[in-house]
A protein has these predicted regions:
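Basic, flexible Lys/Arg- and Gly-enriched helix-loop patches that mediate nucleic-acid binding at interfaces
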Residues: 2-160
Length: 160
């Protein structure tokens, strides 16, 4: 049984358990792959509590301990859990059998600190635009910048 303190949406509980992303949980619900107390649920937004037994793809959902890894991502590694081009991923850099995923991303040709976790709630807080959490980047440049270029950077750079 998965511990839920109060009534919560089923897809959120599934995602917070570490089983899959919220969007994937919604897809599983719509496709009839989720049961609550033995009853198939296909309604998004269905509410559950701590007494409910949730089954996803014929497996009882169990509470997963939250795991947090602060990882230095080197250049030449993709910030995904798998890569169709066969490139090394951030998960290739660690040894774990847990379903972890990166919080945010760093480009393939960049290096830096990256958080890996199975905590969907924390991930949502950190990356959702409504929370307006700043990200800080340090860039090395070749050459010497002039005054105009420095002023432009000091104003900030908006990245799409």
């Amino acid at each position: 049984m998965f511990l839920v303190i109060s009534m919560e949406r089923l897809q959120k509980v599934i995602a917070n358990s570490g089983y899959c992303s919220r969007r994937k949980a919604e897809e599983l619900i719509k496709n009839g792959k989720v049961m609550v107390n033995g009853k198939k649920i296909e309604e998004l937004g269905f509410k559950v509590d701590g007494n409910d037994i949730i089954t996803v793809e014929n497996k009882i959902l169990k509470k997963e301990n939250k795991e947090y890894i602060l990882l230095y991502k080197p250049r030449g590694v993709v910030t995904t859990t798998s890569d169709e081009k066969g490139r090394k991923t951030v998960l290739d850099l660690i040894e774990t059998n847990k379903r972890l995923y990166p919080v945010g991303r760093l480009d393939y040709d960049t290096s830096g600190l990256l958080l890996l976790t199975n905590d969907g709630e924390l991930t949502n807080i950190l990356i959702h635009p409504k929370n307006e959490i700043d990200k800080v980047y340090i860039a090395k440049i070749n050459g010497i910048m002039n005054g105009f270029e420095i002023k432009t950077l000091e104003k900030g750079v908006l990245i799409d």
